[in-house]
């Protein structure tokens, strides 16, 4: 079973969508269930190295918030840019060493608002918030990615016979208080595109990001994807490191 931790680019305290963000971005970090323990261990060791103790203990933040680290806010106000950059890179290296795949989908929020206002796209009227079409497209991309993984495991006899046994499965995990809801999965699996997505677990599991190192790493991926979308003409070394080292596998621009 693959666990897909849904990072979001939102800057709000509880992870909910921020209306001031120009893009709605989700980043699904896919880890096999056998990898989670080692990721947690590396993450805790990293935090002890940078903070002197684990997250949540005296003198340390409760969790890693990408905006705070990147801009030197809150706990990081006294840190030098070099120290903050090193911590970010150390976090990303946990994923880079494993080539842990990240699948991202994004939508320009202004495009969404204009499509609904002008009724330029009938499909836009089916969605209430930008996260709705973004998650629909993300789940489609995840389903296709699982299909590719399943195809890669087929032997010659299975291919010749047309057999397509499903051996790769994925469960989506959303962070508590965020805008990803169970109904999004239910609607996708009932749609024409999702009806054959036999590798997707039908339930979305909700976790507290403070208790999930993988979710915090997924949020970092979403944050730096957002920064790349905002200023694609500028150097974005953290995003480029993820992309060039085969972590970011899918970048799905959602259209309406």
Predicted regions and their residues:
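Phosphate-ester processing/binding pockets and catalytic centers
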Residues: 1-256
């Amino acid at each position: 079973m693959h666990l897909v931790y849904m990072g979001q680019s939102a800057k709000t305290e509880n992870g909910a969508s921020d209306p001031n963000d120009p893009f709605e971005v989700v980043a699904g970090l896919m880890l096999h269930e056998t990898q989670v323990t080692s990721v947690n261990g590396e993450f805790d060791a990293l935090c002890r190295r940078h903070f002197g103790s684990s997250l949540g203990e005296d003198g340390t933040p409760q969790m890693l918030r990408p905006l705070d680290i990147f801009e030197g806010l809150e706990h990081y106000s006294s840190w030098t840019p070099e120290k903050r950059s090193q911590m970010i890179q150390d976090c990303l290296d946990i994923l880079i060493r494993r080539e842990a795949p990240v699948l991202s989908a994004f939508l320009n929020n202004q495009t969404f608002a204009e499509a609904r206002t002008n009724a330029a796209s009938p499909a836009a009227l089916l969605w209430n918030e930008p996260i709705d079409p973004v998650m629909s497209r993300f789940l489609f991309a995840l389903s296709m990615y699982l299909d590719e993984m399943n195809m890669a495991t087929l032997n010659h006899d299975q291919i010749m016979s047309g057999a397509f046994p499903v051996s790769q499965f994925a469960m989506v995990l959303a962070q508590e208080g965020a805008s990803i809801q169970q109904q999004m999965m239910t609607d996708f699996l009932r749609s024409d595109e999702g009806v054959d997505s036999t590798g997707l677990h039908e339930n979305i599991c909700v976790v507290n990001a403070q208790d999930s190192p993988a979710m915090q790493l997924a949020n970092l991926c979403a944050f730096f994807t957002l920064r790349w979308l905002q200023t694609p003409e500028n150097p974005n070394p953290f995003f480029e490191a993820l992309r060039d080292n085969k972590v970011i596998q899918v970048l799905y621009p959602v259209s309406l």
